[in-house]
């Protein structure tokens, strides 16, 4: 299953004239790099323009920003650095995000969790990273378990990691694409269950699939999506993410992160149109 990206599997059959659009999110400092950090232990965030994306949950000198350091199918991506096990940094799309004490929370929903068909991203681990070899930037779907946005104790999310889906050592110095579908294993934080709850009563708490979680939380709504690094990642990590995509009730949203168009005026957000040839470049990735 790791041989190909499910998201773009149809690309090979497309004619050159076929196109697919992605919303382009530019750095706040476009055409320069962003580098948001926070030295304290209290989560802090920053809006990425008015795009609905946020640098979020940044603490203990974690770093996140749209940069040209590790470009993906363009001139940028979302770059992360974690200098220690206490550091953390995320980039998040939040439904009607609001600032609460310097960090951002969702005040709305993107739709029913039951209608989430898939989500995906591309990620990169730099070979200079000294944290555990299986670690890579993770992708999360953020949820309100009972669907009532006025009760917040049941908020949390589900996390994708390759190590719980047949992976072992994360590839380095190359872009990797992963797609999360109904049979993909996810583990939880929060949602009124604590950490890594064993909802399917197996001997292992990390083998509940997306479909299992949807059955367990039939009333849940989606608050947003999150990619990031830390905490608990001892030693150092550097890497990036891009091409974050989700499909909810048949509607697909794809986001590409760039520092800015070459020599052009920057719309906000922009729209990138990929030909089939460009799409082939976008998905020429290593899959284990």
Can you name each region flagged by the protein language model?
Residues 175-264:
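Terminal, low-complexity interaction segments
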Residues 124-204:
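Extracellular ligand-binding interfaces
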Residues 115-127:
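A short beta-strand element within beta-rich, extracytoplasmic domains
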Residues 23-55, 255-259:
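Extracellular carbohydrate-recognition regions
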Residues 82, 123-125, 143-145, 229-231, ...:
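Short beta-strand segments enriched in hydrophobic/aromatic residues
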Residues 79-116:
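Secreted extracellular polysaccharide-interacting domains
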Residues 1-19, 270-288:
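C-terminal cell-surface anchoring/sorting signal
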């Amino acid at each position: 299953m790791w041989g190909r990206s499910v998201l773009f599997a149809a690309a090979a059959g497309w004619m050159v004239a076929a196109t697919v659009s992605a919303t382009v999110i530019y750095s706040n400092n476009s055409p320069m790099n962003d580098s948001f950090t926070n030295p304290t232990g209290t989560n802090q965030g920053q809006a990425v323009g008015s795009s609905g994306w946020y640098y979020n949950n940044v603490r203990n000198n974690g770093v996140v920003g749209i940069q040209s350091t590790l470009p993906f199918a363009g001139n940028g991506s979302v770059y992360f650095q974690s200098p220690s096990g206490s550091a953390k940094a995320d980039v998040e799309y939040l439904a009607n995000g609001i600032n609460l004490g310097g960090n951002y929370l969702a005040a709305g929903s993107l739709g029913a969790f039951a209608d989430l068909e898939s989500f995906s991203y591309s990620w990169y681990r730099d070979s200079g990273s000294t944290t555990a070899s299986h670690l890579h930037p993770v992708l999360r779907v953020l949820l309100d378990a009972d669907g009532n946005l006025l009760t917040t104790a049941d908020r949390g999310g589900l996390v994708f990691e390759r190590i719980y889906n047949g992976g072992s050592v994360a590839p380095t110095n190359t872009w990797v694409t992963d797609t999360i579908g109904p049979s993909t294993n996810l583990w939880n934080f929060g949602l009124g269950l604590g950490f890594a709850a064993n909802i399917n009563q197996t001997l292992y708490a990390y083998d509940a699939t997306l479909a299992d979680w949807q059955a367990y939380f039939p009333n849940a709504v989606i608050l947003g999506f999150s990619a990031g690094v830390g905490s608990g990642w001892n030693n150092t990590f550097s890497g990036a993410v891009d091409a974050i995509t989700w499909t909810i009730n048949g509607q697909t949203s794809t986001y590409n992160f760039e520092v800015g168009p070459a020599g052009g005026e920057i719309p906000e957000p922009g729209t990138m149109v990929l030909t089939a040839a460009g799409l082939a470049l976008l998905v020429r990735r290593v899959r284990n």
